Amino acid sequence: MSNNTKYIFLSPHLDDAIFSCGDYISKLTSEGEIVLVITIFSGYPLSQQLQPSAKQFHKLCNLGKYPIEERKKEDRLACERLQCDFRHLSYYEYLYRKDRNGNFLYRHIYSELKNEDTLKNDIIKELLMHLDDKCVVYCPLSLGDHVDHVFVNSIGRALEFMRYKVIYYEDFPCVSDSSMVSYMGKTK
């Protein structure tokens, strides 16, 4: 039964934590533990023009004009099935984020992380509303170098610096066996 620990999984996008840690989340909830999945980047810019890479991504994934609502519905259903709670934060993923001048910050998935301290601080403030001294935070390792996963990993490191217990998970499918081997320095 529950030991009053709350397990919080930070998910860069809808389905990332479920896809990567669903079996463990299921184990925790079946044992009566409190689990909360917080998706950081689940906002969608309804009024802005999309950059070419976003249009290409939408077409490749056969996403409609406003894909986020269907994806949120799928995520809610997955969380219900796993018997965990969820929060969808309204921040934009890399495809939609712009700088102060209205220019897109990132052109592709593996872009170098920009200085987005204001965004990072806003997200941390929102996360702190869900954290206490008994929680365990699970955060992506970001081994696949997806810019949003790297960003959320930096949030995990900031929470760790603030003395929260943070455990890092392999963010599947961003990491594959070959990228893990390469990351570990064991390439041929």
Explain the meaning of each model-derived region.
Residues 1-151, 158:
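Active-site beta-strand->loop->alpha-helix modules in alpha/beta enzyme cores, enriched
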Residues 161-186:
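Short, flexible loop segments at boundaries between secondary-structure elements
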